[in-house]
Amino acid sequence: EFHFNRYLTRRRRIEIAHTLCLSERQVKIWFQNRRMKWKKDHKLPNTRCDLPTLPRPLPARLGKHKL
């Protein structure tokens, strides 16, 4: 079903839920998760998520404290 249409009508969601003995909510969430996975798998290879970068630690001062 997902290969033909990534979004379901309520009527189709009810039909699938009844056929698979699942709740409508379970079917809805499965389709939501599958859409997210599809988006993730079909990203362009050159695009990447820019994660916030952490500040680099300051370099330790050599020779500041002698033993």
UniProtKB/Swiss-Prot annotation:
The keyword DNA-binding applies. The keyword Transmembrane does not apply. Gene3D superfamilies: Homeodomain-like (1.10.10.60). It comes from the Eukaryota. Residues 1-42 bind DNA. PROSITE patterns: HOMEOBOX_1 (PS00027), HOMEOBOX_2 (PS50071). SMART domains: HOX. InterPro entries: Antp_homeobox_Deformed_sf (IPR050609), HD (IPR001356), HD_metazoa (IPR020479), Homeobox_CS (IPR017970), Homeodomain-like_sf (IPR009057). PANTHER family: HOMEOBOX PROTEIN HOX-A4, HOMEOTIC PROTEIN DEFORMED. Sequence-specific transcription factor which is part of a developmental regulatory system that provides cells with specific positional identities on the anterior-posterior axis. This is Homeobox protein Hox-A4. It comes from Rattus norvegicus (Rat). The gene is Hoxa4.
